[in-house]
Every structure is written in structure tokens, then in C-alpha cells.
């Protein structure tokens, strides 16, 4: 069984703030998921061709088209900090400016 401390550690690494209820819920859910993965490891896949997709098909693609967004100020209004038309975020890498 996954320990609650492990969920807290992963949440910290992902910069997530979890409530006590969420920690308990995620501990249970992740324990179930890991148990299922262990079941999958027991399957005999000898002779089974590796696949990338369940269905043998390619999804259609389209060219990228840049379009101006009509309400830039509305988007930037949600930014905790900004510089002109850009979101301002804390520096995470050391180095020259």
C-alpha cells in the first residue's frame, strides 16, 4: 500500500497543495492504480507485437494557423503578475539574464 507521506512528497514535487481529504483520497486511488499495474505485469506478452495505438489508423492533421485572440486583456486579467502583454512567472533556472 502506498503511504500518505509518499503522496505528500509527489504532491510537493508537482507543486500541488492538497487538503487532508485529498491526500487520503489520492492515497487510496494511487494504491488501486499501482495494484492494477502489478496485475498487468503478470500478463504473458511473449510473442505479442508492441503497438503504439490500439487501432491501426492515423489521425488527420491540419496546418497550424495563427489567429489573433480577441480578448487578450481578459486573459491577462487573470495573471497574478504580468509585464506588458506577457505572464510574469518566477525564475526557476539559475544563469545569466
Swiss-Prot record:
GO terms for molecular function: asparaginyl-tRNA synthase (glutamine-hydrolyzing) activity; ATP binding; glutaminyl-tRNA synthase (glutamine-hydrolyzing) activity. One of its GO terms (biological process) is regulation of translational fidelity. Its EC number is 6.3.5.-. It is an enzyme of class 6 (ligase). InterPro entries: Asp/Glu-ADT_sf_sub_c (IPR036113), GatC (IPR003837). Belongs to the GatC family. Heterotrimer of A, B and C subunits. Allows the formation of correctly charged Asn-tRNA(Asn) or Gln-tRNA(Gln) through the transamidation of misacylated Asp-tRNA(Asn) or Glu-tRNA(Gln) in organisms which lack either or both of asparaginyl-tRNA or glutaminyl-tRNA synthetases. The reaction takes place in the presence of glutamine and ATP through an activated phospho-Asp-tRNA(Asn) or phospho-Glu-tRNA(Gln). This is Aspartyl/glutamyl-tRNA(Asn/Gln) amidotransferase subunit C. The gene is gatC.
Amino acid at each position: 500500500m502506498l503511504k500518505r507521506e509518499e503522496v505528500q512528497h509527489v504532491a510537493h514535487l508537482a507543486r500541488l497543495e492538497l487538503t487532508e481529504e485529498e491526500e487520503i483520497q489520492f492515497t487510496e486511488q494511487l494504491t488501486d492504480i499501482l495494484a492494477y499495474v502489478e496485475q498487468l505485469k503478470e500478463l504473458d506478452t511473449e510473442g505479442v507485437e508492441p503497438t503504439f495505438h490500439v487501432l491501426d489508423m492515423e489521425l488527420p492533421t491540419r496546418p497550424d494557423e495563427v489567429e489573433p485572440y480577441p480578448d487578450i486583456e481578459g486573459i491577462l486579467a487573470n495573471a497574478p503578475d504580468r509585464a506588458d502583454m506577457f505572464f510574469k512567472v518566477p525564475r526557476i533556472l539559475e544563469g545569466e539574464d
